[in-house]
Regions:
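Extended substrate/RNA-proximal surfaces in nucleic-acid metabolism proteins
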Residues: 10-121, 199-204
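Short beta-strand segments at enzyme active-site cores
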Residues: 1-4, 36-38
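Conserved short secondary-structure transition element at the edge of the structured enzyme core
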Residues: 122-124, 139-153
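Conserved, mostly hydrophobic/aromatic
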Residues: 3, 96, 154, 189
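Mid-to-C-terminal alpha-helical segments outside catalytic/metal-binding sites
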Residues: 165, 169-204
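Short acidic/histidine-rich active-site segments
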Residues: 2, 147-163
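Glycine-centered helix-coil hinge/cap
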Residues: 132-135, 177-178
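Active-site environment of divalent metal-dependent phosphoester hydrolases
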Residues: 5-9, 42-45, 99-103, 127-130, ...
């Protein structure tokens, strides 16, 4: 679960978030589903301070941070935030990388981000064309070059923003092989939970 945090716009109440998570966790556990809490952080100059102070959440209590940027962000700003997070012990996961103009113009920059230690996430809806043919084409380019690390749902509700993970998994498996699909949908996301469990399970 990754509620949005954007300073001055989505300043969530952490206590309320934790209470809601506990209710959802208990209900999901009844059907054998494990839920983990994090947040999608709209990157700003105060990101490391808020993370270290506990005012914002990492992914499942790990050192991974789901980082969102302005769609018009320049590459210098993105590089700078990656370096800052890395220097403070965090691993950034660039959320829905297919949406940013800088990567639309040059997908090769994704490889540069990865070389700095960032992970690249793309949306299931984008992969299967729910966000338009242009975005689907870009995801094809990213996947063909093996520049993505994680495919995630970006689901917001069960109506117009429901999850299409199954369809996306089947598409990736058919186009790029089952090993690639497992890596993007299972293995790499699972690494975040493995790190969490190795450090302190009760914090997850």
């Amino acid at each position: 679960l990754t509620p949005h945090y954007r300073h001055g716009m989505f300043d969530f109440d952490l206590d309320a978030i934790n209470q809601a998570y506990e209710v959802m966790y208990a209900e999901a556990e009844k059907i054998g589903v494990m839920l983990y809490l994090g947040c999608e952080y709209h990157v700003d100059s105060g990101i490391t301070h808020r993370l270290k102070s506990g005012r914002c959440l990492t992914m499942a209590g790990s050192d991974y941070v789901l980082a969102e940027y302005k769609y018009t962000s320049n590459y210098a700003a993105i590089r700078g935030s990656i370096n800052e997070l890395q220097a403070n012990g965090y691993t950034p996961i660039i959320a829905h990388a297919e949406r940013y103009e800088v990567f639309i113009r040059d997908t090769g920059l994704l490889d540069d981000c990865r070389s700095m230690g960032a992970m690249i996430q793309i949306n299931a809806d984008s992969v299967i064309g729910k966000e338009g043919l242009r975005t689907k084409s870009l995801c094809k380019k990213i996947l063909k070059a093996d520049l993505a690390d994680i495919v995630a749902s970006d689901s917001h509700n069960m109506k117009d923003r429901r999850s299409h993970m199954k369809e996306a998994y089947m598409y990736v498996s058919k186009k790029y092989g089952d090993n690639r699909a497992k890596r993007l949908f299972e293995t790499n996301p699972g690494k975040i939970l493995d790190v969490c469990q190795e450090t302190d399970v009760e914090d997850c």
